[in-house]
A protein has these predicted regions:
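Register position in tetratricopeptide repeats
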Residues: 35-36, 48, 67-68, 99-100, ...
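Short helix-capping/linker turns of helical repeat alpha-solenoids
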Residues: 52-54, 84-86, 117-118, 147-149, ...
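Terminal, low-structured helical/coil segments at or just beyond the last alpha-helical repeat
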Residues: 177, 181-210
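C-terminal motif of bacterial Sec signal peptides marking the signal peptidase cleavage site
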Residues: 18-21
Length: 210
């Protein structure tokens, strides 16, 4: 019984090493084929590596399709990867869905990541909720990365759309005051807010800052 157990462990170890070697071999071959402009063979070997469970091959194949101006094929690769539990794929799909204005898809891909504390995804998720006029959810997630200059723009907008002008001003003003770049949207919205509220003195103080 002991010998059988040891034999089983050795076999599983050998199998794992063999699979890892095959994966690496197929990825290496695909890399070489792509470097040599043999796209069909590169795709073939990336797909073989993916079938063997290599997640790096997924990213490389999607990047290949992106570089070859086939974004829909890249998206298909990531969707299949997401369905297998690849969270890197979820991040890519969330950002692509935001670009394509498919806001419910953004939530589908991004919310599980954000709920686990991933701050990199909250801009896309919060922006999607904002577009769907779900302001409380937008604020909830955007505040996870409220120090980010790019996040301050939609965060301020969510408050503005709720008619909470004090907090809208707070975040837009912070973007302009605390960041040397990246705040142009917040800057323009801050000036428009001051104009709407007939706050000429504040408008003059910030006009020309960016």
């Amino acid at each position: 019984m002991k010998n059988l157990k040891q034999t089983t462990i050795l076999f599983l170890s050998f199998l794992a090493i063999t699979l890892q070697s095959c994966n690496s071999s197929n990825v290496d071959k695909a890399d070489k084929y792509y470097k040599d402009d043999n796209v069909p063979e590169a795709i073939k070997h990336y797909e073989l590596a993916i079938a063997e469970g290599d997640t790096t091959a997924t990213n490389k194949l999607a990047l290949l399709y992106t570089n070859e101006h086939q974004p829909e094929k890249a998206k298909e690769v990531y969707i299949k990867s997401f369905e297998k539990g690849n969270m890197e794929a979820a991040q890519y799909l969330a950002n692509v869905s935001l670009r394509d204005e498919k806001y419910n898809d953004v939530i589908k891909y991004a919310k599980p990541l954000a709920d686990k504390g991933n701050k990199e995804i909250v801009y896309a998720l919060g922006s999607a909720y904002l577009k769907l006029t779900q302001y409380d959810d937008a604020i909830k997630y955007l505040k996870m990365d409220a120090g980010n200059v790019y996040v301050k723009d939609p965060l301020g907008q969510a408050y503005y759309d709720k008619k909470d002008y004090i907090n809208a001003e707070k975040y837009w003003k912070s973007a302009v005051d605390d960041h040397q770049s990246g705040a142009i949207n917040s800057y323009n919205k801050l000036l428009n807010l001051y104009k709407e509220q007939n706050r000429q003195k504040d408008y003059d103080a910030y006009n020309g800052r960016y």
